[in-house]
């Protein structure tokens, strides 16, 4: 399977924008995440893989989820292929290669050596990013292979009904051959991705000055610091905004409320910020001891656009009860899983809880969720 042709398909299958497979399943409350990619085992065997992490509600709707997956694949198969989407993906891949971050020589050799048998030496470095030839026939050929008769569905669940036990690891499982069971979802209106507004256009480097760090603004409500650094030769920057809350995030209840709200804001932004992620700009929103931090990283050109989007959503989010219930479920799962960490990780967490007043035991956090 050619990487550039499969990438067109997997980028669309894994997209999180309006009308995407991810957006539909997420809005139904059936999934926590969805990702798509290609995997090659040898010259004759390749797969297109869709990984879906389901919610408890979604685990009871596997037939509908699989049905939605094939509805979207059928939609792609029936739609005229979009050359502008391919060109957009190609320009992003070229941008990624142009400003790829340095790696250790050993790491580069380790990753390139297995590809020598299938890639000419001149293309070794650029091959993973190369999307120069638009081949609609090849893309259609791959889409036509994505059928219910040519699929392997794996469902990992604690509540799955099993019939056998694996010989070596003693893992219970069930193997079912034949046509898979799906349920048609009638309220799914699939759409193709639209133009990405976050693709950087201005890539010139800011001249480096002799000042290590400079305060550009300072008053009772706002303080701004700036530092220019072109040492790495890439038009990337980091923007960090800290919103201080009176009294800070101190008690277990404060921590739970802050984490749940941050989770809801992130969830509400998924469709809008996904194009930024594709364009090499990422963000994080996190609760800190003094308040909330918004962190933007990546290509500098469209960072302010993303920052405004995140800040406005943080200040104006309307809480949906169903989304809050899903967020609580995810929060409980994450906190409960801390007990499964490696012993040294648990020891470090306990040490922080003993020494830092704003770090709280998992049971105290769980007690404040409801």
Regions found by a protein language model. Give the residues of each.
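Segments forming glycine/polar-rich beta-alpha architectures that bind adenosine-containing cofactors
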Residues: 124-266
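Conserved small/polar residues in nucleotide/adenosyl-binding loops
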Residues: 1-5
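M16 family metallopeptidases and their MPP-like homologs
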Residues: 21-139, 152-156, 233-370
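Hydrophobic alpha-helical transmembrane segments of multi-pass membrane proteins
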Residues: 9-12, 257
């Amino acid at each position: 399977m050619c990487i550039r042709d499969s990438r067109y398909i997997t980028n669309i299958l894994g997209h999180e924008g309006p009308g995407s497979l991810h957006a539909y399943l997420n809005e139904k409350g059936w999934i926590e995440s969805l990702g798509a990619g290609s995997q090659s085992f040898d010259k004759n065997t390749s797969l297109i893989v869709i990984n879906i992490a389901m919610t408890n509600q979604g685990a009871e709707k596997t037939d509908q989820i699989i049905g939605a997956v094939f509805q979207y694949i059928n939609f792609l198969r029936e739609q005229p292929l979009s050359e502008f989407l391919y060109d957009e993906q190609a320009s992003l891949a070229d941008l990624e290669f142009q400003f790829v971050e340095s790696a250790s020589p050993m790491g580069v050799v380790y990753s390139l050596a297995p590809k020598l048998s299938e890639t000419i030496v001149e293309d070794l470095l650029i091959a993973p990013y190369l999307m120069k030839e638009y081949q609609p026939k090849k893309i259609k050929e791959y889409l036509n292979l994505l059928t219910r008769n040519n699929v392997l569905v794996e469902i990992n669940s604690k509540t799955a009904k099993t019939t056998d036990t694996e010989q070596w690891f003693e893992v219970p499982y069930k193997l079912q051959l034949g046509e898979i069971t799906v349920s048609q979802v009638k309220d799914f209106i699939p759409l193709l991705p639209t133009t990405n507004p976050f693709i950087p256009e201005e890539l010139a480097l800011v001249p480096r000055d002799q000042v290590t760090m400079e305060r550009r603004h300072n008053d009772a409500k706002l303080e701004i610091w700036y530092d220019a650094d072109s040492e790495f030769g890439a038009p990337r920057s980091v923007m960090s905004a800290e919103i201080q809350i009176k009294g800070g995030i101190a008690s277990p209840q404060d921590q739970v409320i802050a984490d749940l709200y941050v989770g809801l804001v992130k969830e509400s932004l998924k469709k809008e910020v996904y194009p930024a992620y594709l364009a090499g700009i990422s963000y994080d929103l996190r609760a800190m001891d003094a308040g909330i931090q918004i962190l933007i990283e990546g290509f500098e050109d469209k960072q302010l656009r993303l920052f405004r989007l995140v800040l406005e959503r943080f200040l104006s989010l309307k809480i949906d009860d169903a989304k809050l219930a899903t967020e609580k479920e995810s929060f409980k799962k994450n906190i409960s899983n801390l007990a499964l960490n490696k012993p040294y990780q648990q020891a470090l967490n306990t040490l922080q809880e003993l020494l830092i007043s704003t770090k709280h035991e998992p049971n105290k956090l769980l007690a404040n969720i409801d």
